[in-house]
Amino acid sequence: MARFVVVALLVLLSVSDLEAIQHPPKIQVYSRYPADNGKPNFLNCYVSGFHPSDIEVDLLKNGKKIEKVEHSDLSFSKDWSFYLLYYTEFTPNEKDEYACRVSHVTFLTPKTVKWDRNM
């Protein structure tokens, strides 16, 4: 019986250690094609290397959430960190600003990364 209790305790400690691992997401915002004003394109926000898996990602146009956004399935890398791709169709122009806002347990406040049309 004592052996079972020790094994159970070790398992619980191991699981709690896994939950304690936290890695902030790397955020990359880019378009599928080079930016050309007036030409349809896709805006991508790739978040990677994060743990735990709970994350909230929004694509923004002029600071407001874009509603029609699709995303890949949550996947994980060899190191057990997670990654996702969020994307939407958009038509760039000179006046509109686009960004990706990410909320994760590793951030005190959501982090926003702007799209750089020259990247």
UniProtKB/Swiss-Prot annotation:
Any one of the GO BP annotations: antigen processing and presentation of peptide antigen via MHC class I
Domain of life: Eukaryota
Compartments in which it is found: Secreted
One CC-aspect GO term: extracellular region
Keywords, alphabetical: Disulfide bond, Immunity, Immunoglobulin domain, MHC I, Secreted, Signal
All residue ranges annotated as the Ig-like C1-type domain in the record: 25-114
Tagged with keyword Disulfide bond: yes
Principal place of residence: secreted
Cross-referenced CDD domains: IgC1_beta2m
Signal sequence annotation: 1-20
One of the Pfam families matching this protein, by short name: C1-set
Disulfide bonds: C45-C100
Similarity remark: Belongs to the beta-2-microglobulin family.
Assembly description: Heterodimer of an alpha chain and a beta chain. Beta-2-microglobulin is the beta-chain of major histocompatibility complex class I molecules.
Described function: Component of the class I major histocompatibility complex (MHC). Involved in the presentation of peptide antigens to the immune system.
Name recorded for this polypeptide: Beta-2-microglobulin
